Amino acid sequence: PGKGIEMHRQSHSEAWKSIWNRSFVDYGDDYLNNLWYLTMYYANASQGGKYPGRFNNGLWGWNRDVQNWNFYFHWNQQQLFWPLNAAGHHELVNSYLDFRFNSLPQAQKDAREIFNASGAFISDVTERRGYNSAGENANHTPVAEIALDFWRQYQYTCDKKFLEERALPFIIEAARFFETLLVKETDGLYHARKGTGYEGWIELKDGLTELVYARVLFKTALEGV
C-alpha cells in the first residue's frame, strides 16, 4: 500500500534523527563544525546504495550527469570513508567494501596475468565493476590500503562473520600479492621491487609505501587468522 506524505516525512525524519544522534562534534568554530556535519550529510545521502558515491560531486554533479575523470581513483576515493567509523556510521562503509570485495576475482586474475603472481592486485584507477585501468600497473600499494580498510571495519564492529567471510579473504589475497613484491638480495634483506609511489610516475626501488604497507599488512594478516 502507498504511504501518505506525512508518513514518508515521519520515517525520513526518524532516519536522519538516528544519524545525528550517533555522534557530534564541537570544534569551537562554526565553520569547522559545519564542515563536519555537511560531510556526514553527504555520506548518509550518497553511500547507502549498491555502489559507493564517488569522491568528486557524489550525487551533486553541477553539470547534469557529467562527472570528471569517470573512474574511482583510490587516492581520492578512500578519504570519503576514513572518518565514518569513528563517527559511528559503519554501515556507510559497506557499499565501498562490497564494491572492493566483489572485484576480488578480477583482481586475482590481474595478479596472475600482469605479474605472474599469486594474490590479488588492485591499483589506483578502477571502473564501476572495480576492474583495474591498464595504465597504473606499477602502482602496487592500493590493494594493501584497501585491505586495511576491511580490517578497520572489523575493529570497529567486532563482526566475526564479516571478518571470516569478507575481511580475511581480502586481506590474505592482498598479503599474498605483496609477498611477491619482496625479493631477498645478497645483503640478506628483503627489498621491494620497483613501483611508483602514490600518484607519481617515477619507479622507485624499496619505495616507502611498499615497505611500510608490507610490514603492516603481514602483521594484520597474522593477527586476523
Whereabouts are the PLM-identified features?
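The feature captures the catalytic groove of carbohydrate-active enzymes
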Residues: F55-N70, A117-E165, P169, E173-V225
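Short, solvent-exposed loop/turn and secondary-structure capping segments
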Residues: N44-F55, P83, V93-Y96, L181-K184
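Alpha-helical support elements that line or immediately flank enzyme active sites
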Residues: Y42-A45, Q77-V93, A144-K160, E164
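Extended, well-ordered alpha-helical scaffold segments
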Residues: Y31, L35-L38, L92-S103, F162-F178, ...
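Solvent-exposed, acidic/flexible segments
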Residues: R9, V25-L32, W36, F73, ...
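Acidic/polar, glycine-enriched structural segments that form the non-catalytic walls/loops
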Residues: P1-N70, H90, N102-K109
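Sec-exported extracytoplasmic/periplasmic mature domains
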Residues: N21, M40-Q47, N85, F101-P105, ...
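Carboxylate/His-rich catalytic cores and anion/metal-binding grooves
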Residues: W36, A43, H74-S118
